[in-house]
């Protein structure tokens, strides 16, 4: 028997939109993503020793001008390798690091400042680990899914690419996760008659980091009622908050305000890049609002469909906070640039007249 969507999680086919099933609990949504580990030989720190969380986007800049910088995301320092002068960094990478056999010095920055340099680096291959399965608990399956499970062949159990749609407690779309799904096993669920526990394997290889569970649970309860709910978060969690703000915005339609609207940005907490975009989003679209997560995205939002119609005005309060923290940023290759000035230029080009206060 087919059903309407209900519950927090909906498993849907990305090709034809068919809903495979709906449930209220998923095991394996949170976990520890696979991370790359790099050893930086003869590490020479700049300013201070690199410890703990390093940055959301850390660039490894080779001394060879013919090579682009390499990116590590959500980077942590494991400290010095015992008995050596090496530093160990771990982070999410795209496996597009140094070419095979690369030898040469590398300088490291986190977009805000240089962290240090090394004479050489190498990627440490991790032990082979299988990704834990994703288990949808108490799933109300569609007739099509029941038929596939009854057939039982591996081909029938291949659901191809699916979207795990996630809703908040009010039933409003929050975000979704795309992956390739193969049914590994299923069994009757203890949560109710005609419900199953569906185990999927293969495609869900990037779980939400466990340390972000409390932040996600805040969003499960619904969007914030007041601006600056994110202000007490550190940069790492501000970035995760921004990711959810952006993903939620992509699930929703936005009504543009008429031209001539006067916006106000509360800038006292704009001490890093995520805070800049969070404050701008809330200035235009209220608490939990989105108006770009990078310069190009701001340009897109200025074009319409994200709550704004040109021309308009923006009063940026406490603008000196952003100027102090964002005017000496580093490009991937390590060149200085003024993000604060860049944002002002993008807003002006989009018909937003900004007054700094």
Each model region followed by its residue ranges:
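Phosphate/adenylate-binding glycine loop and adjacent helical scaffold
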Residues: 1-231
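Extended, compositionally biased accessory segments flanking or bridging domains
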Residues: 2-13, 19-26, 224-287
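Conserved helix-adjacent loop modules within structured domains
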Residues: 55, 70, 256-259, 264-313, ...
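Hydrophobic, Leu/Ile/Phe/Ala-enriched alpha-helical segments that form helix-helix packing faces
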Residues: 149-153, 249, 253, 280, ...
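A generic structural signal for short, non-catalytic loop/turn and secondary-structure boundary residues
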Residues: 157, 191-193, 255-258, 307-309, ...
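Short glycine-rich, low-complexity/disordered patches
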Residues: 159, 167-172, 290-297, 356-357
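Short, glycine-/small-residue-enriched flexible loop/hinge segments at domain edges that mediate gating
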Residues: 312-321
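Helix-rich interaction surfaces within compact, conserved domain-sized segments
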Residues: 323-357
